Amino acid sequence: TDLAASAPARPIVVLGMHRSGTSAIAKTLLGLGAWMGSEQFVTRRTEHALVQDCNQRLLNGHGGHWSAAPELVDGWVSDPASSDVVADARVALRDLAGHGPAAWKDPRNAFTLPFWRSLLGGDPVAIIVYRHPLEVAASLAKRNDFGIGHSVALWEQYNRALLVSAAGLSVTSVAYSALALDPIRTLTAVRESLTEFGVDLPGTASDAASDVESDRRHHVFDTLPDEIVTPQQRALWGALCGLAPHDEHFTTPDLPEVHPASRELLAERRAAIAARRDADERATELRSRRALLRRLVGKSGRDA
């Protein structure tokens, strides 16, 4: 198809929760020689701005937000809210095409990858990067002032979603702790996996490893206290730690159903965000009406 011809061939998609090392991986991919997009589109976090915008619109259009993603139902990839994003998504894919091996990173890929897969001419390869949930929670508390319950529920939601989204793909998995402790060894393994998957990057692991230094591990946890995490979250962490570093055909691991309390917490967050959006829209409409009224009053005064 025309779209397949203007989309990157076998791109690398980085999958991981916020604050889990996705930025570090993206920087190293850039150092290895991956094309991350035209200069005007690549953000300081090595994200493609158009991909980022499309992902945000996909989550928003289905009633969610990055901090409480929607529960997507079968058929969402082609529903009206997703169809509205297709034209801009094609622009992003064209920008990523034609420059050798391409890659993109946005934590929201965990949910939106099925949409992007539907637009590509072939399957991407994926790099899954995962991090201890309490380290993620500590980082989110510092950056976003999130409570630990919300943060761990969000960690669970993202990681469960990416394990489903990656089904059938060639996947290399990376523990953030390994990347931080031994970046050269970790990136050598990643690069070798990508080569075996048919994606040959020209750079060396030693050159790319220097980009990990600014992403050092500031929060370190080794345990999962029962009073903080649910059994389901503990099972998810075990599944992530058990991922093969090199998997030609990824199979989603079996996981127990999400604890109702975690699901309820994120539903409440979505409801609060929706209420705030409605209030913002009403305030914008009110300001517009006031501005129109002032113009009409001014015109009436001049006519008099």
Report residues per predicted region:
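A polyampholytic, Gly/Pro-enriched intrinsically disordered region
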Residues: 61-65, 147-154, 224-230
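Positions that flank functional sites
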Residues: 43-45, 181, 209
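Residues that form generic nucleotide/phosphate-binding pockets
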Residues: 57, 61, 75, 88, ...
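Active-site micro-motifs of SAM-dependent methyltransferase domains
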Residues: 31, 36, 135, 181, ...
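PAPS-dependent sulfotransferase catalytic domain
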Residues: 90-202
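PAPS-dependent sulfotransferases, especially Golgi type II membrane carbohydrate sulfotransferases
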Residues: 1-8, 84, 163, 192-304
